[in-house]
Amino acid sequence: AEVYFYPENTTEFELVDEIEHLVEFYDGVMVQLPLPPHIRVEAAIAAIPKEKDVDGFRRDSCFDPATPLGIVNYLDYCGFEWTGKEVTIIGRSDIVGKPLARLMTNKDATVTLCHSKSKLSNHIYDSDLIVCAVGQAGFLNCYPIHCPVVDVGINFVDGKLVGDCYNTDGRNVTPVPGGVGLLTRLTLLENVVKAKEMYG
């Protein structure tokens, strides 16, 4: 594996050109987000061929997005019984929320995808599982939660990395750091191996 760093003033054209060059030499390529505001994420991702998009960001990617797939695989490993379970996903991004809802629906869970206008307390109370991917430190702390929580949040408070649900003693919450981020990296590696086997 190789990591390439580029100056923040790299233009969109230069980055896309570099990606199109690098994909010739690797089985899998990913772009670390966020990008500087002058570079469109869509343009950078589109430069990666679908069979090498191991992060699963393209709509036509040959791979499921790494973070959602890592979460589902982890819950499978833990023995989570999907059929008929009420799952609330808070955050409807194209990278986590929406693809995760699709994967969990395919497992026969009943999924509610919430956003900033949702009345969360109604959904949270009835949930068998909550996934929070808001990106707001302590977002869930004010809600009475009686089920497991998968915390996808990445936030910094006083220089420390924390999730969307932290300082919650006694709650069944995946840790940040050391939780979903590790699952994402593991799934990325699995996708790279698959890319090599299928297309290498």
Q: What label would you give each PLM region?
A:
Residues 4, 57, 114, 176:
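Hydrophobic residues at beta-strand termini and immediately following loops
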Residues 10, 14, 39, 66-70, ...:
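Conserved active-site and cofactor/substrate-binding residues in soluble primary-metabolism enzymes
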Residues 8, 24, 65-152, 157-170:
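Glycine-rich phosphate/diphosphate-binding loop of Rossmann-like nucleotide-binding domains
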Residues 41-55, 147-199:
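Rossmann-fold NAD(P)-binding glycine/threonine-rich loop
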Residues 1-28:
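N-terminal ligand-binding/catalytic initiation module
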Residues 1-3, 111, 173:
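Generic structural signal for residues in well-ordered beta-strands
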Residues 14-17, 43, 99, 187:
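Generic recognition of short, well-ordered alpha-helical segments
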